[in-house]
Regions:
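Membrane-embedded alpha-helical segments of inner-membrane proteins
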Residues: 2-166
Length: 166
């Protein structure tokens, strides 16, 4: 019937919308991580001495990179995992068993190229122009993921302290 066709079209659109947003969020995370890790502390110190707005924020993130990296990796993992789960179930619902593997392969390759390789290349090559704006976005990510990052920090410290005893 007409309403069944409309529902299938809406579900197909939802598949592509979720894939798009999952890839965009993952790409942002990859670029921010590469930018933060590629920016030398000496460069940040120079910006701070010149009075560049945001340099102090960037320096704080760089000097204690565990928290920003944890926040970025949490969001990246959530984007990839939730995106893949929802897309997989929608593909199964709309197309059945036959195309789940095909969509999974396409989605995996799309994440690899558009959410990992390309954004990390951009972050490592354009860190000078990205570092200050990236620090503001990373601070937002830390705020959003703070409870999860806090638990991960405690867990990491527990593992680290036990490693010293071995």
């Amino acid at each position: 019937s007409n309403s069944d066709i409309e529902e299938i079209i809406m579900e197909e659109q939802l598949i592509y919308i979720i894939m798009f947003f999952s890839i965009v969020l993952s790409a942002l995370c990859s670029m921010l991580e590469a930018t933060l890790l590629s920016t030398p502390l000496s460069y940040i110190t120079g910006l701070e001495e010149q009075g560049v707005k945001g340099a102090a924020r960037l320096k704080k993130l760089k000097q204690d990179a565990d928290r920003p990296i944890s926040a970025i990796l949490c969001l990246n993992t959530i984007a990839n995992t939730v995106g893949a789960s929802i897309v997989g179930s929608l593909v199964y619902e709309v197309y059945g068993d036959a195309l789940v593997g095909v969509f999974s392969t396409i989605f995996t390759l799309a994440i690899l190229f558009f959410a990992e390789i390309i954004p990390k290349t951009i972050g490592t090559n354009y860190w000078r122009s990205l570092a200050i704006p990236a620090s503001a976005i990373i601070n937002g990510m830390i705020f959003i993921t703070y409870p999860l990052v806090w638990v991960l920090e405690k867990f990491t410290k527990l593992i680290s302290s036990r490693a010293d005893q071995v």
